[in-house]
Amino acid sequence: EQIAGWQRASVKLPDWAACDSLIFPPQVPMEQCSSQFTAQYKARLAQHLLENQLADADASDSTSLVDLTGGFGVARVFDHATYVERQSNLCDIARHNFPLLVLAHAEVINDDSTVVLRQLAPVSMIFLDPARRDDHGSRTYAIADCTPDVLALQDLLLVKAPLVMVKLSPMLDWHKTVNDFAGAVHEVHIISTGNECKELLLVLERERCAAPRVVCVNDEQILEYEANHGSTEDADGIAHASSDGEEPLAGTRTGAIGADRWQYLYEPNASIMKAGCFAVISQRFDVHPIGPNSHLFVSAKPVDGFPGRSFAIESIATMNKRELKQALAGLTHANIAVRNFPLSVTQLRNKLKLKDGGHTYLFATTDAQGRHLVLRT
């Protein structure tokens, strides 16, 4: 188990793997724990939230954290930290590991988190990473099915701390989750690494909030906006249409830019996709959606800082055989992606008779007029 734990840590938590004499937790806690990148992100966020809190003249200069679910990615930024874990073996591991991880200021309590919460004196922040497995070890995603049930404890949590940070499954619908907390959510952080969505992080506060701040993070790419600014829209200026056949591309328009001016293509990163803030990025970066559900954008000029991948468009074709032959001339290998397209990647690859790989990327999608397009980049 220790060898397997070290192997998992070497990928997920290299600082742990480099620490001699560390005891690694069992597989399930290691699977749910934050990666080093996301743990460091949460620590920076906690520091920022604390600084804002300490700016209040009535706030104490001493800061304290209670982690009700045994995590401690944010413990270093607090003067005192309390780790609550109901499994005694994990508490023993924590007591051994904390001094090695420069967390000697952390107190370990072996008890049920809800019991501790009711007896808790006021603290600066409470952190929770609810267990996402049921009594049979199966994965759960709904908040009410996780342990502890943060929704049921929401009022008590905010009595005990002015700031509550909750880590949740990235599988959750964040819009519904924010609504479930009935105005307590002030910030939503959607965290991805390597373009894979890893965590949904909520910051709860006592005052009601109508428009939470949404932060989309993918490694070094960060985009922020307020949730009421187009967060649930696909994009502005798109109308659904259909076509009875694969007509030539000439004359096609989408949004505010004609297809003959499509020079650059943009693919949003995983956090943007999870947020669904397509109208936000369309307006902020002056890029135009290819179609209502394509989630791909184009521009006539290059755009700096787009939160995702950018490509120069070499050619565009409908599924018209003559156009395809001309657009794909000389191509034997390609990386293919499909968005709102009737064929799968495998089906399209077979139809185009292309092998996987190479330096060329093909994006197959459907435009605002319902035409099926293949963009070579």
PLM feature spans:
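SAM-dependent transferase fold signal centered on methyltransferase-like domains
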Residues: E1-T377
